[in-house]
């Protein structure tokens, strides 16, 4: 479950830009094109607040159907940016489908915090930065695999 994977999530200290953004996924989504990157970042900035509001309102009104739909839309919106945030949104969608509304509050709070962080991490984002981050992430993955 995503909540178990992200419960202790913290952005890497002293490593600006590394955190929730998944550079490999984002590079694939924009095809390595700066104009496309800027366009999808603008879409996220425009839509994310509305999606988060819809999720919060649906839960506050205890409307499981609306919550599931809002979480699904949120998941689709963030999937190109963060596999972590998308996984939490997917968990929220699953909880709403099961009618587990009380259990959904911590996920909504996590998504709101992650949403703010994603927007901050997009400031000054460039193809070059993403490529550097993707390389650093690959180096960390190789190091972890080698040390096992």
What does each model-found stretch correspond to?
Residues 1-148:
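Two-component system phosphorelay core
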């Amino acid at each position: 479950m995503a909540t178990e994977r992200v419960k202790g999530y913290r952005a890497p200290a002293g490593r600006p830009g590394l955190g929730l953004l998944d550079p490999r996924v984002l590079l694939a989504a924009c095809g390595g094109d700066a104009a496309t990157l800027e366009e999808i970042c603008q879409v996220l900035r425009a839509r994310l607040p509305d999606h988060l509001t819809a999720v919060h309102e649906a839960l506050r009104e205890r409307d499981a159907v609306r919550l599931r739909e809002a979480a699904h839309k949120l998941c689709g919106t963030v999937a190109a940016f963060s596999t972590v945030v998308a996984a939490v949104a997917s968990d929220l969608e699953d909880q709403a489908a099961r009618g587990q509304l009380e259990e959904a509050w911590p996920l909504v709070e996590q998504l709101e915090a992650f949403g703010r962080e994603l927007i901050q991490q997009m400031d000054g984002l460039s193809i070059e930065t993403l490529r550097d981050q993707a390389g650093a992430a690959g180096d960390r993955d190789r190091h972890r695999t080698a040390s096992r």
